[in-house]
Amino acid sequence: MRRCTKNSRSTNPPRDPNTLSNYNAFRTTHTTVNFDILFEKQKLTGNVMHKLISLTNLEAREVILDSSFLNIHDVKVDGKQSKFELLPRQEPYGSALKIPLAEGVALSKTLDIDITVETTEKCTALQWLTPAQTSTQKHPYMFTQCQAIHARSIFPCQDTPDVKAVIDFNISSPLPVIASGVPVNDVSSSSSKSKNKVYKFHQKVPIPTYLFAMASGEIAEAPIGPRSRVAASPDKLEECKWELEADTEKFMQAIDKIIFPYIWGEYNVLILPPSFPYGGMENPIFTFATPSVISKDRQNVDVIAHELAHSWSGNLVTNASWEHFWLNEGWTTYLERRILAAVHGEPYRHFSAIIGWKALTESVERYGKDHEFTKLVVDLKGKDPDDAFSSVPYEKGFNFLFYLENLIGKDKFDKFIPHYFTKYKEASLDSYEFKSSILSFFSSDSEAHALLTSFDWDKWFYSPGLPPKPDFDTSLVDIVYALAQKWRTASESGFSPSAVDVNGLVANQLVVFLEQVLVFEKPLSAEQSKLMGDKYGLAKSENAEVLNMYFQVGLKAGDKSVIEPTAAFLSSIGRMKYVRPLYRALDKLDRNIAIEVFEKNKSFYHPICRGLVQKDLFGNKGS
């Protein structure tokens, strides 16, 4: 929330260009959702109730909410039937729901709006899985993914991170339900005839709509720490428990010390079916995580450190709009690496940052070094925030904070961290407020203040392309850089690879090695690529990070023996981190096969993933 007087809201335009709501006139403070999950019809039906506070004095004569592809049946204002109008659709933001008011509302007075609604088959936030798409193949499954602007396709709302509300969930389903609130233990049957139960949750900490989350299906739970549980398909529960129980509480204790203790009560992880498009989604109480975390070697759990860190950066202190997404993701990546340093040692933080720098360079190369989306603060007016999704806000944001840490010194920066998260707790802010808060905090420290005022903030915020590269500790990557060099010069040196080359390397070191190979000016030959896979056992790995990179190397080398396993991998996982680059690589090697594999699997992918892969393969024309 902007630090300003309430009266000024009526004259200030909203900070978020990706909402159609008039949230500068009214602000949601409490939302209650009552939904029936109808698996056979693949829709949600019910009502949503918003309590809104007036930010003007009798000025606004309408409430405008975001909505997208919804069937709206009825609207009540303060208990009385109201007219409403769905305005013409404005891509990519949906159809604004306009609710006229009989009279203006006095400053700080509240308004209750009750909307009867159902989702449609065009909903972009819901994914419905048939029993065949789940691991036990017994029951259907449903989950939500609302970030960035998809909550509006579940219910009308002020779909902006600049607004936060307390949420109550009352969800009727024939299968267990998980939501981004704390369970209220009075599960009741919907009716005497119904097999459904009503699952109730309460989220007492105000959250933005993109953190609204639900999942329902065949879900079982097990403890993974004193304040944590894992939820997963029953047949996967034990392996998920084993994967996460060694590190989750260690991560929590580490970040508790860096900022301040975790305030949400429980920290739990839901391992979703494989079509989930992200590594993780930081939904409060329950992180929604990709099954690629489960690598049977505990080496992909960095995702959990990242999503846990979101409990402070993003969920508690939030970017005011997606133009300032680095405030969520740059901070979270920075905190994730501080957790890893506390648990594994400082060199591991630098090792993770080196991997991140590689991802950043790839994003900048793909967009072009002058592209708007390679800036830290981006212009998203009229644009879809999903189109700007890349490693840039994560890694350029991390490097900015790492730069500030090195500029003023780690000890001083460490004192700012808890101050920042305390000052903006339960609020939303933009980059300019971040700048003013750090300058203000160090105003009495002449040395730090001089350093912070003398460097070029605008260059960091608005310059496209790569930032200055930090001086990373390369101790954990030197060994794999050396191995990559042997492969680079193999044809001249007669290098003969063997399994001993990779003995003792962790999965992330293999990933860095393969990343180095992938950027050779002269790619490996198909024969070399196949030899590497055979000698190092790469094709047999159960670690998705390793498989993803090995398949990219093989496709670039023209090694046709990796086409079939790549296609199988693409039919088994929907995480965009893997799916998008593999389709791009497959497209370069054999466009017909790439299109054939996509057409076969597109209904398996989440709508967000499906839409972005379509753009990668076909441009904006779709398939």
Swiss-Prot record:
Comp. bias intervals (Polar residues): 7-23
Localization per record: Cytoplasm; Nucleus
Catalytic activity: an epoxide + H2O = an ethanediol
Binding annotation for a peptide: 145-147, 277-282
Keywords, alphabetical: Cytoplasm, Hydrolase, Metal-binding, Metalloprotease, Nucleus, Protease, Zinc
Catalytic residue positions: 307, 394
PROSITE patterns registered for this protein in UniProt: ZINC_PROTEASE
InterPro entries xrefs: Aminopeptidase_N-like_N (IPR045357), Aminopeptidase_N-like_N_sf (IPR042097), ARM-type_fold (IPR016024), LTA4H (IPR012777), LTA4H_cat (IPR049980), M1_LTA-4_hydro/amino_C_sf (IPR038502), M1_LTA4H (IPR034015), Peptidase_M1 (IPR001930)
Listed GO MF terms: aminopeptidase activity; epoxide hydrolase activity; metallopeptidase activity; zinc ion binding
Function text: Aminopeptidase that preferentially cleaves di- and tripeptides. Also has low epoxide hydrolase activity (in vitro). Can hydrolyze the epoxide leukotriene LTA(4) but it forms preferentially 5,6-dihydroxy-7,9,11,14-eicosatetraenoic acid rather than the cytokine leukotriene B(4) as the product compared to the homologous mammalian enzyme (in vitro).
Protein name: Leucine aminopeptidase 2
Organism: Ajellomyces capsulatus (strain NAm1 / WU24)
Top-level taxonomy: Eukaryota, Fungi, Dikarya, Ascomycota, Pezizomycotina
